[in-house]
Amino acid sequence: MQVILLDKIGNLGGLGDTVNVKSGYARNFLIPQGKAVMATKGNVEMFEARRAELEAKVAEQLAAAEARAEKVNALEAVVIASKAGDEGKLFGSIGTRDIAEAITAAGVEVAKSEVRLPEGALRTTGEFEISVQLHSEVFATAKVQVVAAE
């Protein structure tokens, strides 16, 4: 199924690209999310008329994400207190939700879906560098310090 992308999508293409995708992916994800429209003659003309507006919107989102990334990078170490055993092993774990809430409490709005933990949840005390993906092209690094709760 041919669709016109209205947003940059990883491993697929950028704004304005006409790509061929499976019909289920287009019908169930891309079109309902507003990330693509079917590549009909009318939609192609409508897209060309709105191209500047859509490019400005994408540029604005990118600029906002870069501004948030600077704020996240400027943060001091975000401290999260959790119950821990004698050797620094946590009872439970620190996940993306906990990290997102701690960064938001420190003054920068971050959603849990933006926090990247490739090695999984944090299970020990110590300092960690956490990657935060604020946009498909914008990454920030937050320092998180996990301490044992009193």
Swiss-Prot record:
| Domain of life assignment | Bacteria
What PROSITE patterns does the annotation carry?
RIBOSOMAL_L9
Does rRNA-binding show up as a keyword for this record?
yes
Question: Which UniProt keywords are given for this protein, alphabetically ordered?
Answer: Ribonucleoprotein, Ribosomal protein, RNA-binding, rRNA-binding
GO CC field: ribonucleoprotein complex; ribosome
Recorded hits in InterPro entries, A to Z, give:
Ribosomal_bL9 (IPR000244), Ribosomal_bL9/RNase_H1_N (IPR009027), Ribosomal_bL9_bac/chp (IPR020594), Ribosomal_bL9_C (IPR020069), Ribosomal_bL9_C_sf (IPR036791), Ribosomal_bL9_N (IPR020070), Ribosomal_bL9_N_sf (IPR036935)
Question: Does the UniProt entry include the keyword Ribosomal protein?
Answer: yes
Q: Name one GO biological process term.
A: translation
- The cysteines covalently paired via disulfide bonds are none
Q: Name one GO molecular function term.
A: structural constituent of ribosome
What functional role does this protein have?
Binds to the 23S rRNA.
Q: To which protein family does this belong?
A: Belongs to the bacterial ribosomal protein bL9 family.
Q: Any idea what this protein is called?
A: Large ribosomal subunit protein bL9
Q: What is the lineage of its organism?
A: Bacteria, Pseudomonadati, Pseudomonadota, Gammaproteobacteria, Vibrionales
The gene for this chain is rplI
